[in-house]
From Swiss-Prot:
Localization per record: Cell outer membrane
Miscellaneous section: In many other E.coli strains this gene is part of a type II secretion system, but in MG1655 the locus is missing a number of genes.
Signal peptide: 1-24
Protein name as it appears in the record: Lipoprotein YghG
Main location: membrane
Covalent lipidation (S-diacylglycerol cysteine), chain numbering: 25
Membrane association type: Lipid-anchor
């Protein structure tokens, strides 16, 4: 049956259902965006955070993503390579109950290390897959 052949009430019901579904998706994304913004603000209140020769200097949100920028401390010998530090940091974040909850709610994390010694940039994304979170 084509749309032209559908009775008026069925078509209206179908359109209302689709509109409701799309509104639900938009509402979920809006909520996730607000959560990401709040999470970035909470992290920012505690900056800078130093660990193993690296410093977390910036946290900001972009849509449903919390973007965090870490720099290697100039003139300081780091105890880990940037990749090793990111792997360790990823493990810690994925184990954190608050981060797990945020990821379950649709928040993703993007972590960037700017290595001031080499000028290289290293990046990791944290989401359901990278943290091994099964969708409920």
């Amino acid at each position: 049956m084509s749309i032209k052949q559908m009775p008026g009430r069925v078509l209206i019901s179908l359109l209302l259902s689709v509109t409701g579904l799309l509104s639900g998706c938009a509402s979920h994304n809006e909520n996730a965006s607000l959560l990401a913004k709040k999470q970035a603000q909470n992290i920012s209140q505690n900056l800078p955070i130093k660990s193993a020769g690296y410093t977390l200097v910036l946290a900001q949100s972009s849509g449903t993503t919390v973007k965090m920028t870490i720099i290697s401390e100039a003139g300081t010998q780091t105890t880990q390579t940037p990749d090793a530090f990111l792997t360790s940091y990823q493990r810690q974040m994925c184990a954190d109950p608050t981060v797990k909850l945020m990821i379950t709610e649709g928040i993703n994390y993007s972590i960037t290390i700017n290595d001031t010694r080499t000028g290289n940039q290293y990046q990791r994304k944290l989401d359901r897959t990278t943290c091994g979170i099964v969708k409920a």
